[in-house]
């Protein structure tokens, strides 16, 4: 994926405002593996940290992105996880995005098609998605809405089937399709034990958001039948 090092990138601020990252104070990464950067968390610990360098063309190996995932707490929300995503612009590291609304975040994954996926989930039994997704549009990293599709996907599920928890995203091979996989619950199910089968949800990006193209439903009987019981 070709990503110019000197492109103008944007940072999302509260209330949806955007500001150029070059207007933000440069950040030193000398202690990226031990010291929390730009964090709101108290007693903050660095869980993972690293770099994603340019992997294409004349700039191969040049610095592009860096990240931290963090753990700590706030007085208002208790124990939390967080992430900080940084971009290399004009010789400096500046903040691209950050979030402190999940229980855990994981190292970002960069696809060959210019999708940057940072997995995350919330606390509690629901383990709802706190993922972040960005798409390179030749000049900047554009944040992609990953939540709206969940409000309408029920229209494409079988009757009496619902999604009660977070889904498992697979964005690693966008050439084949963007995918979300999940178990399905029936109305009488316990939160622990879905009996409604499974769904593979095929997604695409339209106007800056994930949209549902198709839902492949796998009934519970097909999912649960062991190979030894298959008809020969």
Where are these regions (language model features)?
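Bacterial N-terminal signal peptides
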Residues: 7-17
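Positively charged n-region of N-terminal signal peptides that target proteins for export
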Residues: 1-4
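Terminal domain-start segments
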Residues: 21-103, 225-231
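Short aromatic loop motif centered on NTY/YTY
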Residues: 101-136, 140-201, 218-229
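Surface-exposed loop/turn elements that mediate protein-protein interactions on large endomembrane-trafficking
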Residues: 82-98, 133-148, 205, 209
